[in-house]
Amino acid sequence: FDYVLANPPFNVDDVSLSSVEKDRRFNTNGIPRNKSKVKKADEGKETVPNGNYLWISLFATSLKSQGRAALVMANSASDARHSEADIRKTLIEQNLIYAMLTLPSNMFYTVTLPCTLWFFDKAKSDDRILFIDARNIFTQIDRAHREFSEEHIQNIAVISHLHKGQRDKFIRLIDHYFAAGMERLIENNEKIEPVCAQLLDVLDDANGKHAVDELLQHWRELEKLQTHYAQYRKEYVIAAEIDKKNQTQRQLRSAFDPFFAALHEGLKRLDK
């Protein structure tokens, strides 16, 4: 196959060894075996201790010479020992593994089991393996469920692009975030003064009223920042080199940092 996407059952333990040990789809990289020697009375009845690496081998051997695969696998497969460690070593020596991404728990709707995404690429241009720890990146849906937002997915994907040296995709993503953020600020600009007026009407202590006044003063700095953003857009479009585009982005962020820090501090003061 050119591409394989798979979410196989985890930790299957009832596969007969005799049904897979002579099948090249499963034995090319080695077969998972029990650590202890099988008793003579049980010969021919032996099972594979865990089916995770049977799935891994199946997907690895199913790829064409330029093929790629992405599979969901139990976390335990990432550091399984004994015969499974030997298979993993073989996959690394074959330079098949492109990346491994550790996911947060509670990403499935029916089980809490944490898992890891394995990525294979038979057309890798180097011998590096990208490891991404995304266990603390999620949106909490409810007490038992989590998911990635669209921004989470884009941010994780851009790590892979940077790993491949594709800085232009990172720069474009940051530019997109700047544009989206500026749009949200402008959308909310008209609402700030009415909200502050309502707060002043209901607050009866001087500290609270002062915090609202300060917050409004900080917000009025947005007009200057709109000028900064317009200048950034001009320089970004003109800049031909990636480093120059990135420099303009850093300058814009430096201009916005005090604005957001002041708003954050003002909201904390108001919350008291």
List PLM regions with ranges.
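A conserved structural/catalytic subdomain of Rossmann-like adenosyl-cofactor enzymes
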Residues: 2-272
